[in-house]
């Protein structure tokens, strides 16, 4: 794979991930609206359970879509490191990408996909969205 193909693949992955993220962000918003309506109308247990399942599913998929972003960057950095280790000279952009990449980039070990965010602010975002979608429904507005 050439450097151009690596960056093209990264950009295509980020565009597709963005489309999925927009879709799931909208569904998380729908879940939040459903929770607001359920709380305002003092909904029954069946409505609360269905709303909780929908909200958790939307939030899970939203988190899953955003887990691809750091993994995509790590995969591109790994591919560039493999390309560099094979003796191919990288452009200044490729070298800059590798040098600016946070963490260790290895040509021998591929990045591992994980849905657990390593950014504390993103973790706080997911936890606050979890409260807004599920916590308000079961705990209330106390």
Predicted segments — roles?
Residues 56-72:
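C-terminal TM-helix exit segments that contain a strictly Trp-centered aromatic cap at the helix terminus
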Residues 69-101:
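Juxtamembrane non-transmembrane "cap" segments at the membrane-aqueous interface
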Residues 26-36, 111-142:
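Transmembrane alpha-helical segments in integral membrane proteins
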Residues 38-59:
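Interfacial segments of alpha-helical transmembrane regions
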Residues 1-33:
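Cytosolic-side membrane-entry/anchor segment at the start of a transmembrane helix
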Residues 3-12, 103-118:
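Membrane-interface segments at the starts/ends of alpha-helical transmembrane spans
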Residues 18-25, 53, 57-60, 124-129:
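Residue-level signal for the membrane-embedded core of alpha-helical transmembrane segments
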